Amino acid sequence: SRRQRQMCIRDRYNPDIMDAAKVNVLPKVEEPSVSKKEVEYATFTTPATSIPAGTIGAYTGKEIQPGFIPGYVRLGYGNYGNLDVLANYLFRLSDRDKLNVRFQMDGMDGKLTMPETDTKWNAYYYRTRANIDYIHQFNKVDFNIAANFGLSNFNLSPVQPGKQKFTSGDFHLGVKSTDENYPIQFEAETNLMMYNRQNNNTFFFNDKVGETQVHTKGLISGAISDEQSINIGLDMRNLIYNKDLKLADDLQVYENRTALALNPHYKLSSDSWNLRAGANVDISFGSGKSFRVSPDVIAQYIFSDSYVLYAQATGGKLVNDFRRLETICPYALPAGPILDTYEQLNAAIGFKASPYPGLWINLYGGYQDLKDDFFEVQEEMDYNNNPSLPDGDGQGENTPSPVTAHQYLNLEFSNTNNFYAGMKISYEYKDLIALSAAGTYRNWDAKEKYSLYMKPACEINFSADFRPITGLNINLGYDYIGRTKVEGIKAAAVSDLHAGASYNVFKGVSVYARINNILNKKYQYYLGYPTEGLNFLGGLSFSF
């Protein structure tokens, strides 16, 4: 991952655009941390060339350090109509009250070359996000209230005609205990979340559908010694849809349901050991398997201050609500009932070491088992034989001319598993240089082999950050994702060589620029959807 330094916007949303391959259910290994380091937020931007990205989480207030600069504005533009707008301001109303306001818009509008046919597509994709967050610090409890709004506007490919709009909004209330002297600690939150999809699968139905979700989370911890605690976590989602949308075979696409997750676990934190031993107990009402259990075990052994042996066995349910469907593949349409994905097991072992100051080496390997894992598939539909479409009677009469068959990108499900192994090396020298290289290999298997077509088989990442003089930051990076071969066919690998720089021209004023896909490679993050060729973005940022 790129190491980008340092902006004082204190929220938990990374302004970088996430690669599409990073937002699904690929294995997550709990990499141990020997010493805590304060999070640094980026002034350097990654342009919206791999949109869409993960949805924004609510801002959560953090302790503000002396000399903190509360305001930040960033404006950038590039070829392919790449747009980058970000504004954030943190109002310090008092020593106990803070209000954060944020607005972000990114996107693109340009001609892309379709794979296989080489035809031009006038593509556009714009995302707008607005957030407001307030936190009050009582003597022993923090109170948090927040509201978030999101809007995504984009069009579908020429072989899948149409456009789409996602509108989301949510309201958040939360409390968290802060007095560490108390033997009982707690945190709780509830979220009222709305989401609307304007258009759906035009071959089966074309109607707006709304999702209302009440998401409640809680954690209570009881200390049994200075190093040990017993904890119980709860996560409950109630999902309600405003319409009964059914496919041609009378299958319900979105089902009202309740997903309840309980997470009892024991924790030990000492100079040499970090242990977490528990279970994920998942209960479902209204859809899917009603009862599942998976482990929640993490063990880390630290020796010689900078050497760590670690192992994990984790799992749990991934609720496929509208927000997650957008991050997985916004272009895909439901071809059957939407099921929730379950990670039955993610087991890994690893070794992390720092044999030299600033140098870290991390080796790991493991196995992951997924139930009802998503995959994308293209289906060709004959426009003339669907009476539900406008101007069609199902007999080939009164149909648009010329006669066409559209390829719809659909979401389907399959049980998958993979063995994986990887290594990461990083090196930092003072505040002048930061280097990192990582590689991961995965061996996938599934009953439906074609479901693995877009799965990553090999990932390689390299990043180099330099600060040769005060105020100048230079970054060079490379991202590679090799796809899984299915029946002798393999999708083109993602190969993105990118570079960028930012320079502090005046106090509080910086100029930045970035170039992506320098090699001008053709690849896809989503099946059948091209990405931009060589592209650049530049602009100004202001802190005040």
Label for each model-derived stretch:
Residues 67, 77-81, 120-126, 163-167, ...:
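Short sequence motifs at beta-strands and strand-loop junctions characteristic
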Residues 52-57, 64-73, 77-117, 122-130, ...:
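Outer-membrane beta-barrel translocator/receptor signature
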Residues 5-9:
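Short, small-residue-biased leader/transition segments that mark boundaries at the very start
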Residues 93, 132, 136-140, 173-181, ...:
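Outer-membrane beta-barrel proteins
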Residues 68, 73, 274-276, 282-286, ...:
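Exposed, low-structure sequence patches enriched in small/polar residues
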